[in-house]
Amino acid sequence: MPQSPDREDPEIHGGTREISVKITPFTTTPTPFSLRLVQGPGSPRNFTLAREEVVLGRSSEADIQVDSTDLSRKHIALRREHGQYTVHDLDSRNGIYLNGVKIHSAVLHEGDNLQLGSVVLVYHEGRE
């Protein structure tokens, strides 16, 4: 089927064709690092990790307070180091279990489960 004169086939006639492409930059919405309380008093609940160090415990002096007798007043510290959070036991009575393994400190990864006595939290990594 013959083409109209204004739509030449560049393969046959050696012509060129101009095209216009709109490029939209890809941007992501920042999401904060967070802990989700999935088991324990007040669950379900989300806590944003907005500072370089966040202390979690049952005391009103803790940055994140969870009212459970299984928690020490200052049970754990979450520290942001090199763009990721680490969890540290603050000499708590019941310790920390990370994905079922007792630890003293560790780097956290997306979806990690932290168990502090009967309290269970899930860690979610943020995007900047």
Mark where each language-model region is.
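Forkhead-associated
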Residues: 43-120
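Short, Lys/Arg- and Gly-enriched loop/turn segments at beta-strand edges
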Residues: 121-128
